[in-house]
């Protein structure tokens, strides 16, 4: 297996698909990286030369991926919480941040249902 940005990428798949195993690289970015490295997107990882892998690694090093990207995202969320912006408050309370309604659903963000016992009549 070839290692790019600390991730073992599958050898049998095309380079564009394999690059998407790295956190922070999607299909569009993977295509740009392959084009920049002068590698055909159809090439399988096992068929790449060491020189081509080296070029791809150098290009990927210019992007924020894996741990650096995760760290930056966490710091951004912490900053929002520290300045007590609306988005930061929603993050702190574990509620949807982007304006979704919460009366009925939002179960992914709110967690499992906390059942409240009915008042006996």
UniProtKB/Swiss-Prot annotation:
PROSITE patterns: RIBOSOMAL_S13_1, RIBOSOMAL_S13_2. It comes from the Bacteria. The keyword Heme does not apply. InterPro entries: Rbsml_uS13_C, Ribosomal_uS13, Ribosomal_uS13-like_H2TH, Ribosomal_uS13_bac-type, Ribosomal_uS13_CS. The keyword rRNA-binding applies. GO terms for molecular function: rRNA binding; structural constituent of ribosome; tRNA binding. Pfam families: Ribosomal_S13 (PF00416). One of its GO terms (biological process) is translation. Keywords: Ribonucleoprotein, Ribosomal protein, RNA-binding, rRNA-binding, tRNA-binding. Belongs to the universal ribosomal protein uS13 family. HAMAP family: Ribosomal_uS13. NCBIfam families: uS13_bact. Part of the 30S ribosomal subunit. Forms a loose heterodimer with protein S19. Forms two bridges to the 50S subunit in the 70S ribosome. This is Small ribosomal subunit protein uS13. It comes from Staphylococcus saprophyticus subsp. saprophyticus (strain ATCC 15305 / DSM 20229 / NCIMB 8711 / NCTC 7292 / S-41).
């Amino acid at each position: 297996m070839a290692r790019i940005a600390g991730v073992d990428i599958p050898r049998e798949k095309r380079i564009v698909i394999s690059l998407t195993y790295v956190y922070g690289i999607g299909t569009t970015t993977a295509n740009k990286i392959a084009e920049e490295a002068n590698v055909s997107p159809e090439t399988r990882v096992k068929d790449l030369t060491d020189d081509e892998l080296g070029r791809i690694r150098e290009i990927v090093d210019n992007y924020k991926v894996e741990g650096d990207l995760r760290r930056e995202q966490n710091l951004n969320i912490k900053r929002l919480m520290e300045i007590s912006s609306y988005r930061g408050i929603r993050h702190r309370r574990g509620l949807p941040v982007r304006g979704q309604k919460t009366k009925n659903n939002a179960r992914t963000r709110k967690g499992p249902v906390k059942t409240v016992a009915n008042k006996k009549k």
